[in-house]
């Protein structure tokens, strides 16, 4: 499958059309961003790690009955995926307090959240991805009630699967974001799941093993990503 035209260039991936109108190529770059894209750096191997990590996770979710856009890996940095009509709202599941939740509510980082929280954010970098709710989605027509209910159910199901997967690897799945779209009328998980869009802590030391290492200038970003992949059994080489 060959890349044709560049359809979209995001902060860390480029999307290309193919000769099949129903399929796209996701190309993972070495770019790493923070502050809604205001700070960008490149890290060797990052595109490869995230591409293979994403394929591994999507395969696990598919096996658990969660429909994803993943078709197959094409190369170290490219994957073939279904073309989705993306929903402009992203879902966040929080198992422990971290990030914006800590700032917003003034609670302690790491506080367990039971049951896990489900948040919605409008995908808009210029507006810093404002938090919204189901009422906003209905009023502004971003997504139907039926599809949003499916997105919520699939997010919680993904949390069950992935929390156990990471726990078995000695990691805590603190929180993560998911993006969904429609494929021939069906709600399907799209975009990616990687340490770029999730928080992962070592279960024993609580060391951060995700993009917070870049956001907080902790160093060792790729080493942490590769360690997570190694523990999960993601084939990198």
Swiss-Prot record:
Please give one Gene Ontology molecular function term for this protein.
Answer: phosphoribosylaminoimidazolesuccinocarboxamide synthase activity
Q: Name one GO biological process term.
A: cobalamin biosynthetic process
Recorded hits in Pfam families, A to Z, give: SAICAR_synt
Q: What EC designation does it have?
A: 6.3.2.6
Gene Ontology cellular component terms for the protein in this record: cytosol
Its top-level enzyme class, in one word, is: ligase
Which family does this protein fall into? Belongs to the SAICAR synthetase family.
What UniProt keywords apply to this chain's record, in alphabetical order?
A: ATP-binding, Ligase, Nucleotide-binding, Purine biosynthesis
Q: Which Gene3D superfamilies match?
A: ATP-grasp fold, B domain, Phosphorylase Kinase, domain 1
Give the protein name, as stated in the record. Answer: Phosphoribosylaminoimidazole-succinocarboxamide synthase
Gene that produces this protein: purC
Q: Which organism is it from?
A: Edwardsiella ictaluri (strain 93-146)
The record, for SUPFAM superfamilies, names: SAICAR synthase-like
* Biological pathway: Purine metabolism; IMP biosynthesis via de novo pathway; 5-amino-1-(5-phospho-D-ribosyl)imidazole-4-carboxamide from 5-amino-1-(5-phospho-D-ribosyl)imidazole-4-carboxylate: step 1/2
Disulfide bridges in this chain: none
The record's catalysed reaction(s) read: 5-amino-1-(5-phospho-D-ribosyl)imidazole-4-carboxylate + L-aspartate + ATP = (2S)-2-[5-amino-1-(5-phospho-beta-D-ribosyl)imidazole-4-carboxamido]succinate + ADP + phosphate + 2 H(+)
């Amino acid at each position: 499958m060959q890349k044709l035209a560049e359809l979209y260039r995001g902060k860390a991936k480029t999307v290309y059309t193919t000769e099949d109108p129903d399929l796209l190529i996701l190309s993972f770059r070495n770019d790493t961003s923070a502050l809604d894209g205001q700070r960008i750096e490149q890290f060797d191997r990052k595109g490869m790690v995230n591409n293979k990590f994403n394929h591994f996770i999507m395969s696990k979710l598919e096996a658990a009955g969660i429909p994803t856009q993943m078709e197959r890996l094409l190369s170290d940095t490219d994957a073939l995926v279904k073309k989705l009509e993306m929903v402009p709202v992203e879902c966040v599941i929080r198992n422990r307090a971290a990030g914006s939740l800590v700032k917003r509510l003034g609670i302690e980082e790491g506080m367990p959240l039971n049951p896990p929280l489900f948040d919605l954010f409008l995908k808009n970098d210029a507006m810093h991805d404002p938090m919204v709710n189901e009422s906003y989605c209905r009023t502004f027509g971003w997504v139907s009630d039926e599809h949003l209910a499916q997105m919520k159910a699939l997010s919680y199901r993904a949390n069950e699967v992935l929390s156990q997967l990471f726990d078995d690897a000695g990691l805590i799945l603190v929180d993560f974001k998911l993006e969904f779209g429609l494929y021939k009328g069906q709600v399907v998980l799209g975009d990616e799941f990687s340490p770029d869009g999730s928080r992962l802590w070592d279960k024993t030391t609580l060391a951060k093993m995700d993009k917070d290492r870049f956001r907080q200038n902790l160093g060792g970003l790729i080493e942490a990503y590769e360690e997570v992949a190694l523990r999960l059994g993601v084939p990198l080489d």
